[in-house]
Amino acid sequence: MGRYFIAVAFFAVFWLATGASNSYAAPCLIVTLTGTQGGPQSFNGLAGAGTLVRFGDDADECGAVKLQFDAGRGTTMRLSQLKVGPEQLDAVFFTHMHNDHTEGFADLVQLRWSFNGTGPKIDVVCSADSVSPTGVTISCSKFTAHIADAFIQSGEVAQRHSELKERTAGGPAELINTITFQPTDEPQVVWSKGGVKVSAIRSAHIAGHASYRVDTPAGSVVIGGDAGNDAPTPPRSSSASEQVEKLAQGVDIIVHSVIHPVMAPGKGSGMFPYAYLRQTSVPDLAGMAKRAGVKHLMLTHMIPPIGGEQYPFKLPGGLLTEGDYTKAAQDGGFTGNIIVGTDLASLRLPAK
């Protein structure tokens, strides 16, 4: 771990000192929502939470570096619609270990192993083991180490290896390079490659939750995940994360989960108060984005989904529209570009 962070620190300094944009005649950044479903429910074919960040040059269609942040159900299907295969990803980053953000990862690495069974390994970046206030250990490293256990126990890994010996005998986990870090209240560089620097910061939701910032010569994006305020209940100034606000200073784009105020306790939805209060409301996220000087706000993981209920909870006032989310963000004071996320919604910097 120590060697890793020494190396990262060196590359961070090198990245700044050399002006990484020199190697890109026309650098560009594309941020795409690979899944926008809020929570583990299924609705209208929405994929589980995930964001693809691509950086490069006009000549390579902004595709020199490809990073996947979270991998909810259906991630590989959405990536296929973008003509991005699992073998093309440089790294996967997890904000936290909830299944709506992770359950598509087994599919992703199984596909890499099936068709690229000798490597190279894929970097997986996530928090080190964290213990919750109730004593539960949240472990990304165990998640990745055991990602293919079901396929091993069923005999599939052995059967496929017997057909093609070039595949690693131990299955997909042997093609994962897990990089863990201890989340802190200050941004730290956790990954770097080809003019791209990724920083992380601790944020509240469950133990080990982290939010990320990607800086490139073409622009920057913060992936907030499901971050909320450290104070689990009111009184508090905002439901938004103060750490994410720190991370997002001057960033071009924020991608963040949101919950609409119609789900708040006492408004008839029946949603569990703890579940509502650990999410960031749309107006509070918008206010935070305004304070941080953000230009583009991409709403994702929306609770409730556009045009649907958040089962098993109710919407006494009726189903929400894209306009309802836009208005809630405007009510929070944000005057920049608002994107109410749908699967495969994309934003390119610079715009073409």
Language-model segments: what does each one mean?
Residues 207, 218-220, 228-342:
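Cap/insert and terminal regions of metallo-dependent hydrolase folds
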Residues 24-221, 233, 312, 316, ...:
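Binuclear metal-dependent hydrolase catalytic cores
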